[in-house]
Amino acid sequence: MVAIAVVTVSADETEELAGRLAGRLDPGDVVTVSGELGAGKTTFVRGACRALGVTGRVTSPTFTVGHRYRGSVDVSHLDLYRFRGLSSAEWGDLEPYFEGAVVFVEWPEAGGAALPPSRAAVRLEHVSPEARHVTIEAPDGTLLSGLVAE
């Protein structure tokens, strides 16, 4: 695994970073997004959605489990917060979200081995009320090369 780490000082900067990552993704790619409640997971996904041409409102799917957005490519946004692990029946309900879309999964820990391999894993941590420490890991350096200024 290769990782980069950066501190963003505003929601706009977090969205901008997400947008740069999103521009490197293709349908079928899965990005996991982890962090405490309020760490900025949905903010990160919103920035990615904007970069992928989504113009509508991007909200947390905590109570609906998933949203599918249309943009220049389809984007699926899942939130597994309410799950303790995915049963095969629950996975069957989620599987359509993975077809032909770039997929962002919040609280991926609940998905366990049921989730397909991720192209990138994002972790957000509070630094201050506005600032976030963002770590992005990928299997190799190709996806991350040049993502942030050295």
Where would I find each of the regions flagged by the language model?
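Short hydrophobic/aromatic beta-strand immediately N-terminal to the Walker A/P-loop
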Residues: 30-32
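Short phosphate-coordinating micro-motif centered on Lys-Gly-acidic
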Residues: 2-5, 87-89, 93-150
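Conserved lysine of the Walker
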Residues: 41
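Phosphate-binding P-loop
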Residues: 22-27
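P-loop (Walker A) phosphate-binding loop of NTP-binding proteins
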Residues: 34-36
